[in-house]
């Protein structure tokens, strides 16, 4: 594959994956058309991103102990996983794949793959910030907190992974955690935590909107309110049916998140995603002296509490209940997100006036982003397998642009491609 073969490229989806892929393709000299069925960038999963720019703090959802969490989710009202006792055969099959990835060795491998993509993404974000004067309200440092000694002990067993990956981290007791985050509620049980000084957080939506202007200046064409209904591949390249009309490109990148499989399945391309609902709450800070200093991860609930400018963003929950595919906020999710914020920062914000977001996300069973070629010529993918951070998505986009252009990526992409499932 040479870059010359793929000069005119369509990218489907104007979320974080799509717009970053478009940027790096345009930077390499490609003519890029970004096609989006909504009226603007970041209208779906990217809108609900946690804001974490994390390499150390981003963990695969398939972690040791997942099977127990799935079982307990059927009986606990405030479980981070929302699951119905009645499962479809397809969802049950996906859950089995998800649980298989929670074995320690698989977790170690997936964590390594996610970390290398995120570390690369962090470097690229700094370059983009300097080159284009992007301001995405960045903050430094992430603290992961554990409510019980058992949770802390379980996490400590995984410390070797952090050491092997040469990730800067500190194991903290409760007093040290409160020194870093002095506004944590003193009445909520706290056993200890991890501090990841090189991780951080930022406003993903701000970043995407600024990237939109940047790629437009680079010549990327946007087609909003346009729906791709079919994909084909032939000798002339990739043929996209857009609102009933055929359009020919040298290649296409499917970066449509939860809508990707619908386009890929007719080509016989099988990607092991399931569609989940993800949730976020945003509350305006009323008492800055009681607010988080930076980004906090509640290990028990797999939930991020992130201060971005004058707001607190609480994101988490994995809703795998059938029938909850529309943008409907689950009452249980609303209650749990606000409970977590109130547990740790009760006086920081007007939680009773919080705004909520709910949207579909594509979940991969293992966690690392999925990029690269497919068995169908001229058809590439970029699917973010996790919604709890965005550094890895940026790194994966740059690596994908290199693959499409016939260049050697800066990171090992063997574990980020479709072949990892075969």
Where are these regions (language model features)?
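Glycine-rich phosphate/pyrophosphate-binding beta-alpha loops
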Residues: 58, 199, 302, 320-322, ...
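Helical element adjacent to the flavin cofactor pocket in flavoenzyme catalytic cores
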Residues: 153-165, 188-238
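Short beta-strand to alpha-helix junction loop
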Residues: 109-119, 144-154, 194-213, 326-333, ...
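Glycine-rich FAD pyrophosphate-binding loop
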Residues: 27-47
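Dinucleotide-binding Rossmann-like beta1-alpha1 core, especially the glycine-rich loop
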Residues: 48-174
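C-terminal catalytic lobe of FAD-dependent flavoproteins
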Residues: 169, 342-422
